[in-house]
Swiss-Prot record:
The keyword Hydrolase applies. Keywords: Actin-binding, ATP-binding, Cytoplasm, Cytoskeleton, Hydrolase, Motor protein, Myosin, Nucleotide-binding, Phosphoprotein, Repeat, SH3 domain. Coiled coil: none annotated. ATP binds at residues 129-136. GO terms for cellular component: actin cortical patch; actin cytoskeleton; cell periphery; cell tip; cellular bud; cytoplasm; mating projection tip; myosin I complex. Changing residue 472 to K: In MYO5-1; temperature sensitive loss of function. This is Myosin-5. Changing residue 1123 to S: Abolishes interaction with BBC1 and VRP1. Residues 36-715 form the Myosin motor domain. Its main location: cytoplasm. Residues 1085-1147 form the SH3 domain. The myosin motor domain displays actin-stimulated ATPase activity and generates a mechanochemical force. Residues 719-739, 740-765 form the IQ domain.
Length: 1219
């Protein structure tokens, strides 16, 4: 089967199109990681909490922790280092759109920095999630990226960058602690603003602190720790500090050892202490300031070691005054005054506007412990606020701030077994952040659709404003307002204040988001229902240090302590100081106002498990977080309009490869408007119009499946281009290999002769002149090629048969044929078989049709060494009996055209095989039963076959047994070929394109490479001969095994050379006589007339011309594929007929006369003979000048070579057969 090649393209030279400056050339991303799940939750086919969880789980287990919801980043804490925050990874995100790279916190940072520069807008990122979900880590990575991405032109800019980064270890040490859920939990909230100058370089910064958890200083639950700085200081303090401040190990202090957890996994306190000291130096804290900070920390630790006992009156008394003396030394206050402030409380009585009496009320042990702890908490809280203000002072040292990027890292939503005032404050702030998240997200979405004039369907969502009002409202009063009223009513008694607050809570029972339960109340937050304890909640809301403690600190001689406690006691003031609830409401509203002035980005963090394990994924816990974070609503809001949107330029840059209007060979060629380019891309990609809308500046795609289809087509583009390049390269290499093989074969044949012809000659000797020869066996091109079914190739029918019958060895001979099958009481049948010969075994393969699929099975497996003899007749039939030496099987009787070649291969493999040739074939029809098959001459038998009936073979008389193989014909001479081409062009007028359209289309069977049908005498063998190389087809040197079909109408613009003209150049150029002088002009010759030798009913195709035996027609064109273009004598119909069915009409004696401009008469057309030989008529008068003839021939040869070069890709010549 010939290799099909595409026709060559007509290449038109064009100037390369200028690529738009806004569209980048597409490149194949070889480092692209195979995606697990979807990188954007809006692309989920099904939207549900379970589907979101399943997608996050797949990515988490694949070490992919980041996922988008539109522009919102979802981050799952991996609890391990994934190596995704290196400088190399950071560089991959610089200057990239978020769709060009996988989801990452660096992509959010790049987007903020880019938007600030491009749109001159303030940016902020809101990081939310529960404790231990990775909020602080995300904030650190954003600061890391912005510091690295922004340019540095001056030393001061570089210093600001270093200071911004130094705030992380400093504030982590003083504001983070180990909890049961997180080893580095932020116990405060902060909003860091990085300010940039007009060149977008960081030039300043500011930190706002929110609600430090002061209670952690004095008490922690079991297996938790105090703030990191206490353990860093007690473990890593220098000898000078230990001597000056009396620093001991953490086990020696109540505040650090009471919870039973001194160390924590993944935390190195000594190393972190050095990082803290380094950060202090970078920020600009002097050594004296550092000494005072650590002096206060030592004082807090020693305050915690102050303990009390009961005196004789049952009041509190300091157990060890040496401890209070050392605390007084550290705070630089009077020791007795300190003791008095810890065990007594000053009370004043008022009489209207007059000041009343002052009383010193002694405290019991519980009250004294509370006063001690209040002093420690006050010192640490004020120290933390001073550190934040000191950092801000350093960051504001450089003027010129224009725009800013804000990073909000705030505590996550908290639900504990016992929840008090701290939890209601934390959860209130998270409610406010959720509110602004929903408002800004939905508002931004609505504004986008309105701006782009896009139609969309609004989505319902839960607005938690009602919960925020429940907590913060003043009219009607909310929970904080009710708490303030209770404190004002019973300020002197905490228990009374709690009872008053419980009574006021009855006002909220009608609110659907509130529930009252005895001494507890429930608020139904967006993240879940939280139960709060009433006991002690009002006292925490006061947030006031006792006036006597304030007066105590006012007596200090330490200027640093006086600095961090700037407020003095105003005993005359009657105005109620602000409570903790007032402060948190003001801070939250200020935060919302600040965030509303910036363009927000969002990071929603998720904690996958409580075990802090990198391999555990708790579905139940994650599902709870998905619900209270509102991820499903966020996805629905995002997809309420469209799952994907992109500006025209970016969309074209991404997908222009999908449209031939916009691209060629990977280059962007579109010169028009980008909107038109978008339309062409969507149109050429067959995207339905209802799946997208075009806005003013952006394209909006409805469903994620549409985007998947576009991305898939874009990916396949690169695969298709690679396949085309590979195909062209393989074709080039194969042509080189074929050319080299042809040259090598020619050289070997010149030196040693053709091995296939040698094998043929050896086979002729094997028969020893004892058997009549068939005409096809004597052809000069006949050679013993062996594997006619191409079994040894990877993709062929022979290889398929070989695999079916499980043959592992190399096949040296393969052919289709027949085998005689006998049945008891019935006539023998000739069944189709396939014969495969390997170096050791002869296989006879049968075929059966099973469910419309051909199945091949082994009928015989014969060891070559077990073959005793082969038996043949002495006539030209093709029957062979394989006689086995010892076997329980009968001897197979087979029929194949290439019997001589099969016997030759068997003889070479087993020299002991006897070749028995006689008038009959003898073989064992059954084991032990000898059977004889006679052969007789019958001229009525088929010319190319035989008749088998009743153990008798009837066949025509063949060639004599001693007939020799014809000499292989010489190849065409290039000069004669050129002469022939020149003559052909001169003698016949080329058919115009318009005329070619009227030529009948070739029969449908010829389009499938099917040869013309054989004459009726050969049709009884057509089925078996169809897959056998026809020796008759080897008459022409340019033919291959598969007979080519005649050209279609579209390829017949130029007529082919006549067979007679081709015959003129068959190796006789040395004897060509000089042409005679030009004769006078003659009339135009008529077409040759042919007569139908057989009936040709045709296949029903309109391009065929049905004929009856004896019909006479004109033959206007003859093709080498076996078809001729015929026309009725009256010219009423024209069509294709098989050449083998036609013979020259006896009354046709017209010889065409030569044209005026040539001096060589045109030869007569070949007559097609039944024996497949040609009787060529050579003109007698060829007596012109040899020089003129050679000149014309060379000119024609040059013209032919030029034409062949132009059409080389379209019509490559078939490889020449060697046999």
């Amino acid at each position: 089967m010939a290799i099909l090649k595409r026709g060559a393209r007509k290449k038109v030279h064009q100037e390369p199109a200028k690529r738009s400056a806004n569209i980048k050339k597409a490149t194949f991303d070889s480092s692209k990681k195979k995606e697990v799940g979807v990188s954007d939750l809006t692309l989920l086919s099904k939207i549900s909490d379970e589907a979101i969880n399943e997608n996050l789980k797949k990515r988490f287990l694949n070490a992919t922790i980041y996922t988008y919801i539109g522009h919102v980043l979802i981050s799952v804490n991996p609890f391990r280092d994934l190596g995704i925050y290196t400088d190399a990874v950071m560089n991959e995100y610089k200057g990239k759109n978020r769709l060009e790279v996988p989801p990452h916190v660096f992509a959010i940072a790049e987007s903020m920095y880019y938007n600030m520069k491009s749109y001159n807008e303030n940016q902020c990122v809101i990081i939310s999630g529960e404790s231990g979900a990775g909020k602080t880590e995300a904030a650190k990575r954003i600061m890391q990226y912005i510091a690295a991405a922004s340019s540095t032109h001056t030393e001061s800019i570089g210093k600001i960058k270093d200071m911004v980064l130094a705030t992380n270890p400093l504030l982590e040490s003083f504001g983070c602690a180990k909890t049961l859920r997180n080893n580095n939990s932020s116990r405060h909230g902060k909003y860091l603003e990085i300010k940039f100058n007009n060149q977008f370089e960081p030039c300043a910064g500011n930190i706002t602190n929110y609600l430090l958890e002061k209670q952690r200083v004095v008490s922690q639950i079991k297996n938790e720790r105090n703030f990191h700085i206490f353990y860093q200081f007690t473990k890593g303090a220098s000898d000078a500090y230990r001597q000056t401040f009396g620093v001991q190990k953490p086990e020696q202090y109540v505040y650090t050892a009471a919870a039973g957890c001194i160390s924590a996994e993944t935390i190195d306190d000594l190393q972190d202490y050095q990082e803290t000291l380094k950060a202090m130096r970078v920020i600009g804290l002097g050594q004296e300031e550092q000494d005072q900070i650590f002096r206060m920390l030592a004082a807090i630790l020693w305050i915690g070691n102050v303990s009390f006992i009961e005196n004789e009156e049952g009041n509190a008394q300091v157990r060890d005054t040496s401890v209070t003396d050392f605390v007084a030394y550290l705070l630089q206050i009077d020791s007795q005054l300190l003791i008095k402030s810890l065990v007594e409380r000053i009370m004043e009585t008022n009489h209207g506007m007059k000041r009343g009496s002052v009383y010193h009320v002694p405290l019991n042990i519980v009250q004294a412990d509370a006063v001690r702890d209040a002093l420690a908490k006050a010192i640490y809280n004020n120290l933390f606020d001073w550190i934040v203000s000191r950092v801000n002072k350093s960051l504001q040292a450089f003027p010129g701030a224009e725009k800013s990027i804000g990073i909000l890292d705030i505590y996550g939503f908290e639900i504990f077994e016992h929840n008090s005032f701290e939890q209601i404050c934390i959860n209130y702030v998270n409610e406010k952040l959720q509110q602004i998240f929903i408002q800004l997200t939905l508002k931004s979405e609505q504004e986008t659709y309105e701006r782009e004039k896009i139609q969309w369907t609004p989505i319902k969502y839960f607005d938690n404003k009602v919960v925020c009002d429940l907590i913060e409202a003043r009219r009607p009063p909310g929970i904080f307002a009710a708490m303030n009223d209770s404190v004002a009513t019973a300020h002197a008694d905490s228990n009374a204040a709690d009872q008053a607050f419980a009574q006021r809570l009855n006002l909220f029972t009608t609110n659907p988001h509130f529930d009252l339960r005895s001494n507890k109340f429930v608020i139904k937050h967006y993240a879940g229902d939280v139960t709060y304890d009433i006991d002690g909640i009002t006292d925490k809301n006061k947030d006031q240090l006792q006036k006597d403690l304030v007066e105590l600190i006012g007596t200090t001689t330490n200027t640093f302590l006086a600095t961090i406690f700037p407020d003095t006691v105003d005993r005359e003031s009657k105005r109620r100081p602000p409570t903790a609830g007032d402060k948190i409401i003001k801070s939250a509203n200020d935060l919302v106002e600040t965030l509303s002035k910036a363009q927000p980005s969002y990071i929603r963090t998720i904690k996958p498990n409580e075990t802090k394990s990198p391999n555990d994924y708790d579905d139940r816990q994650v599902l709870h977080q998905i619900k209270y974070l509102g991820l499903q609503e966020n996805v629905r809001i995002r997809r309420a309009g469209f799952a994907y949107r992109q500006v025209f330029e970016k969309f074209v840059e991404r997908f222009y490869l999908l449209s031939p209007h916009c691209s060629y060979a990977g280059d962007y060629t579109w010169q028009g408007d980008t909107l038109d380019a978008v339309k062409y891309i969507l149109q050429d990609s067959s995207i339905p119009q209802q799946e997208y809308q075009l806005g003013v500046t952006s394209v909006f795609i409805k469903t994620p499946e549409t985007l998947f289809a576009l991305e898939h087509m874009r990916d396949r583009y690169w695969h298709n281009m690679a396949a085309r390049i590979q195909r062209a390269w393989r074709r080039f290499l194969q042509r080189r290999i074929d050319a080299a093989t042809k040259i090598q074969r020619t050289i070997r044949e010149r030196k040693e002769g053709n091995k296939y012809e040698k094998l043929r000659d050896y086979g002729t000797k094997v028969l020893g002149g004892r058997k009549e020869r068939r005409s096809m066996s004597l052809l000069g091109y006949r050679a013993f090629m062996g594997d006619y079914l191409s079994c040894n190739e990877s993709k062929s029918k022979g290889a398929y048969i070989k695999r079916q019958v499980s043959i592992k060895e190399k096949v040296i001979f393969s052919i289709h044929g027949e085998a005689l099958h006998t049945k008891f009481g019935r006539s023998a049948q000739r069944l189709k078989k396939t014969f495969l010969l390997t170096p050791t075994t002869l296989y006879i393969v049968g075929q059966t049709l099973v469910q419309n699929a051909m199945t091949y099975t082994q009928d015989y497996k014969i060891d070559v060494r077990n073959i005793q003899a082969v038996s043949l007749t002495n006539l030209q039939d093709d029957w062979v009996a394989i006689k086995l030496a010892s076997s329980g099987q009968p001897d197979p009787l087979i029929n194949t055209y290439f019997k001589t070649e099969l016997i030759t291969h068997l003889k070479r493999l087993n020299d002991k095989i006897q070749i028995k040739i006689g008038s009959a074939i003898e073989y064992q029809k059954k084991p032990g039963k000898l059977h004889s098959v006679k052969c007789q001459i019958n001229e009525s038998a088929p010319k190319y076959g035989d008749i088998y009936k009743s153990s008798t073979i009837s066949v025509r008389r063949g060639n004599p047994p001693n007939s020799q193989v014809h000499k292989k014909p010489r190849k065409k001479s290039s000069i004669s070929s050129g002469y022939h081409a020149s003559s052909s062009q001169a003698t016949r007028r080329p058919v115009s394109i318009a005329a070619a359209q009227h030529v009948p289309t070739a029969p449908a069977s010829r389009h499938s490479k099917k040869p013309a049908p054989p004459p009726p005498g050969m049709q009884n063998k057509a089925a078996t001969r169809r897959s056998v190389p026809n020796p008759a087809s080897t008459l022409t040197a340019s033919q291959s095994n598969a007979r080519p079909s005649p050209p279609t109408a579209a390829t017949r613009a130029t007529p082919a050379a006549t067979p007679a003209a081709a015959a003129m150049g068959s190796g006789r150029q040395a004897n060509i006589p000089p042409p005679p002088p030009p004769p006078p002009p003659s009339s135009k010759p008529k077409e040759p007339m042919f007569e139908a030798a057989y009936d040709f009913p045709g296949s029903g195709s309109p391009s065929e011309l049905p004929l009856k035996k004896g019909d006479v027609i004109y033959i206007t064109r003859e093709e080498p594929s076996g078809w001729s273009l015929g026309k009725l004598l009256d010219g009423s119909k024209e069509g294709w007929v098989p050449t083998a069915y036609m013979k020259p009409h006896s009354g046709n004696n017209n010889i065409p006369t030569p044209p005026q401009n040539r001096d060589v008469p045109k030869p007569v057309l070949n007559s097609v003979q039944h024996d497949n030989t040609s009787a060529n008529v050579i003109p007698a008068a060829a007596q012109a000048s040899l020089g003129d003839g050679l000149a014309n021939a060379l000119a024609a040869r040059a013209n032919k070579m030029r034409l062949e070069s132009d059409d080389e890709e379209a019509n490559e010549d078939e490889e020449e057969d060697d046999w």
